[in-house]
Amino acid sequence: MPKVLVTGSSGFIVPHVIESCLKNNYEVIGIDVNDPVIKDERCKYIKDDVRNLNEKDLKDIDYIIHLAFITNIPHSIQNPIKTTDDNIQMTVGLLDKAEKANCKKF
């Protein structure tokens, strides 16, 4: 069974993404700094920051659906450049780790 990592698993759209993955027989792992919006016993959830993942964590992951972003609106308004930079760095860092771990798709 292919394994998919869904980042930002407490986000608004993620329940639909996870449900679609499960219907298509994917093993699903969600990661977010917050508790998941939906709790499905068929999914494994990790409560952590995506930036803390390493290559070893991704070694058995076939696909990554990256939906994690800093969405704190007051912080984003006060620090738009830092927030944008942090989001870009998070994505680039995850892409780099995924490539080194030989993930099939990002």
Language-model regions: role of each:
Residues 1-106:
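N-terminal Rossmann-like NAD(P)+-binding domain of SDR-like oxidoreductases, especially those catalyzing
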